[in-house]
Regions:
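Interfacial catalytic loop of ABC nucleotide-binding domains
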Residues: 59, 76, 83
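Conserved AAA+/SF3 P-loop NTPase catalytic/coupling segment centered on the Walker-B
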Residues: 28-30, 44, 64-71, 84, ...
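Short clusters of hydrophobic/aromatic residues that line enzyme substrate/ligand-binding pockets
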Residues: 4-5, 73, 79-80, 88, ...
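Nucleotide-binding/hydrolysis machinery
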Residues: 3-12, 16-24, 28, 33, ...
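Short glycine/serine/threonine-enriched helix-capping/active-site loop
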Residues: 59, 139, 166
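Conserved glycine(s) of the Walker
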Residues: 37
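AAA+/P-loop NTPase substrate/partner-engagement loops
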Residues: 51-73
Length: 178
């Protein structure tokens, strides 16, 4: 199989998918092993979209424990009245990339599902709804269908985020990118 590669290291077939996806505001899941360029693809989708002049925020599901993840995603209202804005608010009108979405705890997955359904959420310790308009792109190095089978990932969330799917080959199969 022959692939044409561009200087940015994205196969021609993937660039064609990006062009199509960028014309929509739909959610995207990008699958591929670590280091294969999933973030690069997500950035390219954002850059070519109508949201390109707004924020592109990245939240890595593998790096945070449950309590920190919830605050990082939804924000936090402190006892003194101050607010720490989460990734959803920071990405409002722009794009949020949830990297390693498979690592998000199930309880938080259900809250993400609500955001996708209602376009609103509550900050940690908050009582008021916060409305957002965010394009969600998720990436994973795990097979989400297998994660669903073993009970680590919600099937309803999978169907909400999997409007478009991009599969990235490992770098060892893209020798010209190395």
């Amino acid at each position: 199989m022959l692939f044409l590669f561009y200087p940015e290291g994205i196969p021609h077939s993937t660039l064609h998918q990006i062009e199509k996806i960028s014309l929509t505001d739909s959610r995207v899941i990008i699958n591929g092993p670590s280091g294969s360029g999933k973030e690069l693809v997500a950035r390219k989708i954002h850059k070519k979209s109508k949201r390109n002049n707004k924020a592109f925020i990245i939240l890595n599901g593998a790096l945070l424990d449950k309590e920190k993840y919830e605050a990082e995603l939804f924000g936090l209202e402190k006892d003194d009245g101050s607010i720490l804005y989460g990734a959803l608010e920071k990405a409002n009108k722009g794009t949020l990339l949830i990297d390693q979405v498979s690592e998000i705890p199930l309880e938080i997955q259900s809250k993400i599902l609500r955001v996708l359904t209602d376009q609103k959420f509550k900050r940690v310790n908050g009582s008021n709804d916060v409305s957002v308009d965010v394009r969600l792109i998720c990436s994973s190095s795990k097979d989400l269908k297998k994660e669903i089978e073993i009970g680590n990932f919600r099937e309803d969330l999978f169907h909400r985020i999997n409007v478009f799917e991009i599969n990235i080959e490992p770098l060892n199969q893209r020798i010209s990118d190395i």
